[in-house]
């Protein structure tokens, strides 16, 4: 399984990409979408919503289960990916390009608490045993 090195990861299987303008893009990992299976519904947070770190803020539903998505960082939702709301299967096609929402972080120090690719791979290995 490919774990992109340029991203950071939450233990709850969300990824973040730090953008050049200081905002972050959030999605779910390949591992998460594989566990869930074929996506059928996505509910994203409203633009302007203020999120606390680890607050449940979105829902993805698959043919197997529904799962909450947690904010990997605190901040304000500044954009959502309406394309995945109308075509949830895009998450299955490529979970790293089918982002869910963008945040303006309230506290960039929280990024340091997230896992790097190596740390996330170790988490997956420990989950497998």
Swiss-Prot record:
Biological processes per GO annotation: glycine decarboxylation via glycine cleavage system
Cofactor: (R)-lipoate
Keywords assigned: Lipoyl
Domain Lipoyl-binding, chain residue ranges per copy: 23-104
Domain of life: Bacteria
Residues bearing PTM N6-lipoyllysine: 64
InterPro entries with a match to the protein in the record: 2-oxoA_DH_lipoyl-BS, Biotin_lipoyl, GCV_H, GCV_H/Fam206, GCV_H_sub, Single_hybrid_motif
Subunit structure comment from the entry: The glycine cleavage system is composed of four proteins: P, T, L and H.
Name listed for the protein in its UniProt record: Glycine cleavage system H protein
UniProt source species: Nitrosomonas eutropha (strain DSM 101675 / C91 / Nm57)
Encoding gene per record: gcvH
């Amino acid at each position: 399984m490919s774990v992109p090195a340029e991203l950071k990861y939450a233990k709850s299987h969300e990824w973040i990409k730090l953008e050049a303008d200081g905002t972050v893009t959030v999605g779910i990992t390949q591992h998460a979408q594989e566990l869930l299976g074929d996506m059928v519904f996505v509910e994203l947070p409203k633009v302007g919503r203020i999120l606390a770190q680890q607050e449940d803020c979105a829902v993805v539903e698959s043919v197997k289960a529904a799962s909450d998505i947690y904010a990997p960082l605190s901040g304000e939702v500044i954009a959502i990916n309406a394309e995945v709301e109308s075509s949830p299967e895009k998450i299955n096609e490529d979970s790293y390009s089918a982002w869910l929402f963008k945040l303006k972080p309230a506290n960039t120090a929280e990024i340091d608490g997230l896992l790097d690719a190596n740390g996330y791979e170790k988490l997956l290995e420990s989950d497998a045993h």
